[in-house]
Curated annotation (Swiss-Prot):
Keyword Kinase: no
Protein name: Transcriptional repressor NrdR
Cofactor list: Zn(2+)
Domain of life: Bacteria
Entry function: Negatively regulates transcription of bacterial ribonucleotide reductase nrd genes and operons by binding to NrdR-boxes.
Cofactor, how bound (note): Binds 1 zinc ion.
GO-annotated molecular function: ATP binding; DNA binding; zinc ion binding
Pfam families, sorted: ATP-cone, Zn_ribbon_NrdR
Domain ATP-cone: start-end pairs: 49-139
Biological process terms in GO annotation: negative regulation of DNA-templated transcription
Amino acid sequence: MKCPFCGKENTRVIDSRPADDCSSIRRRRQCDECSKRFTTYEKVETIPLVVIKKDNNREPYDRSKIEAGVFRSCHKRPISVDQINALVDEVENTIFNLEEKEVPSNKIGEIVMDKLKSLDAVAYVRFASVYREFKDVNTFMNELKKILDHEHV
């Protein structure tokens, strides 16, 4: 593997262990030329997943789109980056466990909302307001009422 510091290809693995998510392997490497250390992750290659958009267009699955939406929803909330990454990992695992080659974007959105609802109600409402495209205040208020009713059960 090429060293990210000096560009030489003489590197060796000095430590290898399962990563936090147990679906990848974290490897600590050292360059034989410059002696600097760096970390790499090895992950199982998954079958390519295609997302069916609302307009029926198809595009390759892109984890960063889910991350961006969740990060926006959690902005200025007491939610750590680790919690957000764990949520996105859960969403991704759920999607891949469907074992479908094509997944509608609305299914992905529902999975994200389900995970966000249990993490933070405000982040959930923020995500839902964009995802569900609330047309007016009444629709927005109805969704808030559902959340409040659910919390008081």
